[in-house]
């Protein structure tokens, strides 16, 4: 009990320290920019988010400021319209366990046992999930189970044809469109030490599955806020590209996270990366 209280106190102190930075410390911890490199604000991001159908919040998985802003944005969107949440961090076949936790039929220990939680879940995602639980918000487990993405990486997309029908519900409906010439997938080919053609395919099946999950659960008039790694939606590709393929009429807003040594201006390489780009001081400590 003492350790739990101390952990909560540390979280509160950390959040307060961020507020102090925002309220006037000379050394800023983060800044927002538009895709054209113009300095902007959280207030404008919030205003634009309220008008979107879908918001893709691209994060650095170990960045505490991104995680804090995810919670803040969720809170600020409460009550405006029907709010639906979704996250890369939960895989489709863990939906029942996640629902059980949100509905109170299983506790945290049960969720730990039944779901494949990320190693940084308790520090980085539990506050967001618990907010959803308190506010009775649904969270959609959007991602493909990792073992199927690994199968694509090792053997290519054709390996999915061997899956039994009972397992195909965990992945995007086949066949799905794939464009290996998209710039983000091209970068992955260059980064790959092994199977350079298969690596972007494994990424694409994640992107396509998450997009299908989002579009399937989105309801007209609602707002869907989705958390994912920045690479999954940067430069209006990945999840964004697949959502556009599925429904070109959706109003989609993208957020990306970036680390820089200076917050004075946006790096030219990041122009066009997202509608709003969260730039964090590169000296910011990571959660792992």
Where are the regions that the model predicts?
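Positively charged n-region of N-terminal signal peptides that target proteins for export
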Residues: 2-12
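Sec-dependent N-terminal signal peptides
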Residues: 12-21
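N- or domain-start disorder-to-order transition segments that initiate the globular core
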Residues: 25-52
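N-terminal, post-signal-peptide region of Sec/Tat-exported proteins
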Residues: 50-83, 89
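Solvent-exposed loop/turn segments at secondary-structure junctions
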Residues: 60-64, 90-94, 145-149, 230-233, ...
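Short internal beta-strands
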Residues: 84-91, 254-257
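A substrate-binding/cap region within the structured catalytic cores of diverse enzymes
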Residues: 97-217
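C-terminal regions of proteins
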Residues: 209, 215-218, 232-288
């Amino acid at each position: 009990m003492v350790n739990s209280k101390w952990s909560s106190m540390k979280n509160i102190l950390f959040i307060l320290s961020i507020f102090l930075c925002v309220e006037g410390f000379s050394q800023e911890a983060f800044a927002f920019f538009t895709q054209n490199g113009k300095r902007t604000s959280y207030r404008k991001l919030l205003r634009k988010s309220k008008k979107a159908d879908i918001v893709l919040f691209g994060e650095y998985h170990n960045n505490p400021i991104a995680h804090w802003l995810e919670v803040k944005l969720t809170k600020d969107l409460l009550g405006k319209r029907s709010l639906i949440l979704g996250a890369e961090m939960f895989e489709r076949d863990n939906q029942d366990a996640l629902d059980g936790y949100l509905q109170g039929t299983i506790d945290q220990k049960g969720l730990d046992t039944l779901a494949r939680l990320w190693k940084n879940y308790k520090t980085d995602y539990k506050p967001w999930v618990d907010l959803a639980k308190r506010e009775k918000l649904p969270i959609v487990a959007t991602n493909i189970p990792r073992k199927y993405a690994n199968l694509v990486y090792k053997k290519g997309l054709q390996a999915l044809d061997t899956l039994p029908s009972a397992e195909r519900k965990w992945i995007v409906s086949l066949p799905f469109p794939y464009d290996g010439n998209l710039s983000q997938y091209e970068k992955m080919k260059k980064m790959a030490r092994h199977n350079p053609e298969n690596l972007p395919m494994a990424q694409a099946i994640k992107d396509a599955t998450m997009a299908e999950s989002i579009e399937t659960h989105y309801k007209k008039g609602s707002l869907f806020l989705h958390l994912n790694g920045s690479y999954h939606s940067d430069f209006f590709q990945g999840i964004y590209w697949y959502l556009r393929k599925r429904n070109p009429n959706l109003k989609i807003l993208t957020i990306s996270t970036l680390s820089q040594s200076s917050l004075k201006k946006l790096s030219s390489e990041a122009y066009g990366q997202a509608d709003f780009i969260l730039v964090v001081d590169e000296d910011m400590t990571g959660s792992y």
